[in-house]
């Protein structure tokens, strides 16, 4: 079969992209190296294998990921169809029989008359022709080098140091304040949470005592990225190490005392909307429950709601907000699209969702139809917007879908609405926006 497009990678994103293309009448070559070469993490040769958890997280449509589920179902997602067909009891979450689900995806993709599944390792980006790269966080070294050469990245495999991200509306600004160090610049760019000496010493000890997550076997030989150091490792190096690093208080006058605090935790705006703020320098291997407990002891963050918790793990992804256009094309080589975790989205569902969009966009392009991106008010549109420009390009890190990526509700600020009401209103708005988009768009044949 002479293919019209080459999809590299048979994970969730690549399988979904190939399916969307084939359903639109496009002939696809899908390359997957498992079957001839194993990865350190996968256990089978099945497409769309779930490497870690068997959970697709909440299926509640008033939760951001549950809303993403609903939107993907509406657009004919293969991954969601097979997940639903192999669902196992998990309360309000969508969990699956991982083997049955992956086998079903493999059977559907391999059996599609317009998809040629080829077990092969691709060592370089194809020179021409439409391509979707969906090789995930364990991209083979040779292909990672080729991607690095095409994108200007020096290295793509490293430990990404993920700092926690906090919803702005949950920060207590009666305790914290906005300022830049020494009041430099015309704007006050940081939210500052002050600590006195006793608070700092207690926080330092809690970091030392906190329960950490162990590295996986296949992560142990991967270097840190740019020498990033977990906050608890800084704590281990001395009681004052953090005060001379990310918790340095100099140049930050607390307007309530007129003095510098003993230490300070700074948060920096993380998205263009200003709804998400990251904890500067707080990459960590603390377990998630420990992070929530410990970081809520920081003055001003007592009721913090986290859009993402910190982490440190091996990953391979590109600087998508800088490199990709709004249709997931590489700006320097627009015949190449990226999809899935290699774009910097985090999670099974998010990876499949970006694969779905990449497949639909590529199909529209090949069929000579206009590319219609989903509205920003939808989960698909919010996630796409974050990846392709909504996030800050410098320091870009993987992110799960969350309501902080959506445009704020009009009227009263989100923090003045009850959390459940705000989510329900955003979900309702998203449903209306998706319907209008689908009614006005051209569906695959």
Curated annotation (Swiss-Prot):
GO terms for molecular function: flavin adenine dinucleotide binding; tRNA (uracil(54)-C5)-methyltransferase activity, 5,10-methylenetetrahydrofolate-dependent. It catalyses: uridine(54) in tRNA + (6R)-5,10-methylene-5,6,7,8-tetrahydrofolate + NADH + H(+) = 5-methyluridine(54) in tRNA + (6S)-5,6,7,8-tetrahydrofolate + NAD(+); uridine(54) in tRNA + (6R)-5,10-methylene-5,6,7,8-tetrahydrofolate + NADPH + H(+) = 5-methyluridine(54) in tRNA + (6S)-5,6,7,8-tetrahydrofolate + NADP(+). Belongs to the MnmG family. TrmFO subfamily. FAD binds at residues 9-14. The lineage of its organism: Bacteria, Pseudomonadati, Pseudomonadota, Alphaproteobacteria, Sphingomonadales. GO terms for biological process: tRNA methylation; tRNA wobble uridine modification. The keyword Amino-acid biosynthesis does not apply. It holds the Pfam family GIDA. Its cofactor is FAD. Keywords: Cytoplasm, FAD, Flavoprotein, Methyltransferase, NAD, NADP, Transferase, tRNA processing. This is Methylenetetrahydrofolate--tRNA-(uracil-5-)-methyltransferase TrmFO.
């Amino acid at each position: 079969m002479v293919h019209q497009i080459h999809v590299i990678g048979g994970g969730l994103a690549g399988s979904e992209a190939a399916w969307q293309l084939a359903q639109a009448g496009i002939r696809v070559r899908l390359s997957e190296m498992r079957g001839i070469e194993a990865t350190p993490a996968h256990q089978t040769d099945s497409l769309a294998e779930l490497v870690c958890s068997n959970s697709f997280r909440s299926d509640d449509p008033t939760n951001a990921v549950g809303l993403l589920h609903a939107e993907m179902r509406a657009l004919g997602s293969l991954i969601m169809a097979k997940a639903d067909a192999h669902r196992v009891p998990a309360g309000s979450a969508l969990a699956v029989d991982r083997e049955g689900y992956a086998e079903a995806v493999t059977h559907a993709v391999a059996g599609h008359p317009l998809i040629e599944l080829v077990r092969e390792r691709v060592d370089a980006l194809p020179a021409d022709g439409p391509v979707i790269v969906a090789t995930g966080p364990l991209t083979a070294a040779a292909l990672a080098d080729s991607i690095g050469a095409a994108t200007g990245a020096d290295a793509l495999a490293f430990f990404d140091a993920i700092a926690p991200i906090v919803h702005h509306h949950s920060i207590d600004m009666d305790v914290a304040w906005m300022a830049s160090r020494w009041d430099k610049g015309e704007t006050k760019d940081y939210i500052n949470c002050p600590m006195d000496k006793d608070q700092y010493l207690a926080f330092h000890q809690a970091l030392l005592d906190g329960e950490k997550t162990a590295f996986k076997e296949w992560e142990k030989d991967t270097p840190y990225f740019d020498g990033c150091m977990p906050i608890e490792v800084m704590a281990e190096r001395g009681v004052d190490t953090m005060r001379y690093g990310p918790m340095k208080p100099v140049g930050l006058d607390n307007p309530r005392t007129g003095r510098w605090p003993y230490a300070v935790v700074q948060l920096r705006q993380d998205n263009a909307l200003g709804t998400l703020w990251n904890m500067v320098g707080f990459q960590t291997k603390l377990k998630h429950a420990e992070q929530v407990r410990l970081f809520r002891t920081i003055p001003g963050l007592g009721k913090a709601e986290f859009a993402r918790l910190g982490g440190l793990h091996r990953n391979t992804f590109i600087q998508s907000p800088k490199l990709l256009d709004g249709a997931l094309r590489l700006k320097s080589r627009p015949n190449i699209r990226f999809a899935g975790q290699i774009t910097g989205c985090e999670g099974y569902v998010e990876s499949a969702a970006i694969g779905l969009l990449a497949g639909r966009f590529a199909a529209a392009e090949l069929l000579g139809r206009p590319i219609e991106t989903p509205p920003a008010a939808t989960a698909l549109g919010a996630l796409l917007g974050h990846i392709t420009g909504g996030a800050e390009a410098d320091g870009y890190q993987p992110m799960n879908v969350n309501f902080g990526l959506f445009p704020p509700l009009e009227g009263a600020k989100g923090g003045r609405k009850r959390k459940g009401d705000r989510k329900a209103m955003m979900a309702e708005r998203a449903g209306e926006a998706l319907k209008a988009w689908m009614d006005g768009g051209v569906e695959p044949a």
